[in-house]
Amino acid sequence: SAIKDAVPELPVVVHTHCTTGLAFMTYLKAVEAGADGIDTAISPFSGGTAQPATETLAYALRQLGYQVDLDDKVLVKMADFFKGVRADFLADGTLDPISMATDTQCLNYQIPGGMLSNLISQLKMMNAIDKLDEALAETPKVRADLGYPPLVTPTSQMVGSQAVQNVLAGERYKVVGKEIKAYCRGE
């Protein structure tokens, strides 16, 4: 609410992921604090590393007395359509069920949703998905070593990739990417 108080004409839109299970509460508090918008996902593609379900938030916010300018009938049609798309994506491997789950350990690993889905994808491409827990545990260590950069693109990908390299090499910093080297040189 301090942002809205200081700059009332500035639109505030909040974006988060459901990875840790806290997104619905985060959005409720953001709306209560005066956020102008929240990013959501239609229910078949919501949850996990995606955003909270549009339909659920629309319902909950209306129940709390907020005006929600969405047509529920259209949302139902959209959800029905995307249920089929989701099923196809799950069947062909485009959508990974791991990334659609809640993982409260991300609170400890300090990994945002988008970064988690990229880590999963990277490990799968290397046939090393069994190393996910080790890579997750290594990530905050790499982040600390690098001086706690914000975990947004591109630094989130750099930290995650280095964590994966450390785990797969069996030794920390045996392999160091050029992006990490440039970051450490201040480039």
Which residues does each PLM region occupy?
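Catalytic cores and adjacent flexible loops of soluble metabolic enzymes
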Residues: S1-E187
